[in-house]
């Protein structure tokens, strides 16, 4: 069994499309540009870190890059038995296994990015990864902060992401270090994702998902 796991927002980096520019799979970038009305190629080739940090750009480029890599792998005759994803990567996985068509996937990711960008503008926030504490200790750090900060992702043993207001995350970071965290790393994202700060995006995204009409896949 071959399983593919697709990444979420925050994995983007400047120039990440350059190794793929002359590959056949680059045609997906051109298709995504036509569907979205955005120059996805320019974002993948030339955008700086701040431009890619914009939620609208980060989600679209990560989604398209992931499917471009998948296309290249499938051209070698390898196909996944199972697809899964982390946050945004769930949408990539749904497209990879045929539950969403590529067009619908691009449009849905654009809507998701726009909705989350707007929510992040209304309620500015940040995210950080806490390394070296167990889940309970990170939760304690958030409670001790007594501010708008929550556990957003339980990524792995000893790696938990917190998110919230800049002040809340700063306070929780202080408490996490006092509890013995090895490191607290700010993430290159432009919002407090997976928290109540994203409530404004929820209803808009629910409608977009229904309109996309995901289908059952084998």
What are these regions (language model features)?
Residues 1-138, 183, 187-188:
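FabD-like malonyl-/acyl-CoA
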